Amino acid sequence: MKKLLINTFLFSFLSLNIEANEALFIKYADKSINSSSLVERQGLKYQVNTNSPFSGRFITYEDEFGFCAKEAGSYRRGLLHGPYEEYAGCGILYSIKSSYKNGLEHGTYSEFDEGFLIMEGNMFNGMAEGEWVGYEYGRISWTEDVKNDETISFTNYSYYDNGQISTKDVYNNNEELHGISEAYHQNGQLKSKTEYQNGTLVRLIEEYDFNGNRLN
């Protein structure tokens, strides 16, 4: 009896924490199959004892009782297609939110660590594309300009202990400083702008003191 009450409490707790965000495993609960009933043949998913590629929604569970959701999504003709999510902590927290088109990741991709967003960007036919952003402690840690799954350039951010941005440095795909680097005083005032090209200092563009008075 005690175990039943604990399980009931946990299920209610999970529902309250996830439902506001409409997690797929909650929306799909009554209209999906357990992915344990799917098998793969030549790269396509089939339900056991069937000959047609599976189309429909699925939920994968960590446990044999179907209590802790691990992932949820849908297949179309045996390939992942549509919204897709992975979970941590028995479904309490998001791990990945993405989407697929004909078996390839396509659309917005978000990745989480212990429920906190750590990376987001866009996928196009299975390849990263456009601007990607990384986060740490809720602040932007880096950005990347990506084309056809390859990094063209990236920017690193550093911060003072008070949360104010300290530096913003731009790098090329060889990890060399390239472009305009910015530094800031602890009060948020711009300290300097410096131009680099392929790792070589080109010029000091601007420099300011703590109060915003130009020094060059």
For every predicted segment, state its role.
Residues 16-216:
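Glycine/tyrosine- and acidic-biased, solvent-exposed loop/turn segments at the edges of beta-strands
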Residues 4-14:
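Sec-dependent N-terminal signal peptides
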